[in-house]
Amino acid sequence: MNALINLKQSREYTTVTIDGQNHHIKLAGTMDDPYFCGKDVCSILRYKDVKQALQNKVKPKNKKMLSVLVKQDHNAVGVQTTSTRLGSNSPLTYNEGKAIYINEPGLYALIMHSNAPFAEEFQDLVYEQILPSIRKYGSYQLEMQLTQAMEQLSIKERDVQEAHEARIKAERKAVRVDKFMRRIAIKERKLEWIYIATTQQYAQERLFKIGSTSRLNTRIGHYNVGRPAEDSYYYCWVTKCYNSKDIDYHIQKLLVDFKHKNNAELYCSIKFSDLVAIVSFIVQHYDASIDYINSFIKTRLVASFDEEDGIPPAIDIRTSLANQGLVVDQDDIDVLIPQELNDSINEKVKQNLEEIVIERKELISKLADKTNISKKDLWTRIKDLTGWSSSKTVIINGDLNYKIIY
């Protein structure tokens, strides 16, 4: 598969060769924001119902009618509108104007959902040849226009330098965006698996193996090497995911208490339906975080690079917690105080001191950092819990005695 792109000769379409046959993809929009004919792309990716594919697979913000794109181009202001515009300059017929064109995210969406065997190869072609060629020629045209404008309008040297720096900045940003878009196009496809497997005998004993793989067919075979055929491993639940090894490790940490004491690869005691619910929940919520980041890269990354951002102000922890309703209640305080006292006592024990003495001010400061309760209220509760009455009071803590002093 390859692509033939010569924008100097024609900016109306790009040609993709698959199995020796040429396929044209009509273009529209601009070289900075190219649009592709949805029908042409669907035909290449072997979608049977073009209308349904464009309606269900591509979000509304990623597709436009050709007539809308042409109208936007004609209404645009600036020197770029003539020489960086893509598509035909001929008047549109009514049917041509209704044709749906998709932008870059829309193109990725159709590729991602396609069942065509060469979908990934076509995706690489888009990244490595089609889009770079459009953008490279667009950058060349922009530089030509800038030079002509400088000659015609006698732009001052300072303005020229600013324009040059702006172009360099835009090119660097484009490289960064392309890098992120390429990364998510790979990671956005769930190509790995989390599975639960067992045998007939193990199932009766509620013993299950949870694992990860990118090759379901071969993995189960490894488990059955040397096992009797009548009690071989089989899959009883599988699901696709983004990063199976990370999820597998996360599951192991969460379910460590259920591992079989004689075989750490097996999980025991949990009813199968409950185990499925637990593992499914872990996978879905792990994938949701990746979906969120991928969505941010596709929908907010460019704007996030460009938008102005002020320096965030410092916050008052206690006020912030109170505004969020995160008040530490009495039970929390009654747990925190003994914990902090034990930590302080252990530190003193390590120093081999003859007498264990804890400074009141230091103790309250440590507790204040962990709560939004006033130091006065903390000190009142410390006295209630320890029986403190003065700096001479000896407080008993198991085998150790200590004092809290001013």
Swiss-Prot record:
SMART domains: Bro-N. Residues 141-177, 343-372 form a coiled coil. It holds the Pfam family T5orf172. This is Putative Bro-N domain-containing protein 019R. It comes from the Viruses. Residues 4-138 form the Bro-N domain. Belongs to the IIV-6 201R/289L family. PROSITE patterns: BRO_N. Keywords: Coiled coil. InterPro entries: BRO_N_domain, Phage_T5_Orf172_DNA-bd.
